[in-house]
């Protein structure tokens, strides 16, 4: 039986670790493995020019409001120099890259907090985080159970925002809202 060849574009904070774990244990699919973690599609295309068109590509996108709360708690979990003991979410939103993401080795502001549309192109199939199991089953044409890994523990994302921070995130990620049909709050 031929394995289906896949390229997974791992946008940060969109269940990528769970996806990779799923494919490590599935013999029906061949995931292109020479990729760096969180590599955007234009690099993948450039570095795999001979194989690129032989693979089915996909990425997962997430509601930007939810993704940013998840990023905040991820950075908080890293406990960067006790930074998060002093900065509240709505304060951090004003300029998140001015703060912790510059302090993490190997993690830049363009990675963790970059708009999702920058990771993909028109050749990439988009699955939504909010309906991931269902969309993944449809995309793979196979019933799979996605493991939950790296989940941050926090309240519903809307509990963290005020009107000003909702507006900041909408304008910062406006293209993601439009391209992936997420609603402005």
Where do the protein language model's features map onto the residues?
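Membrane-interface amphipathic segments in extracytoplasmic regions
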Residues: 1-185
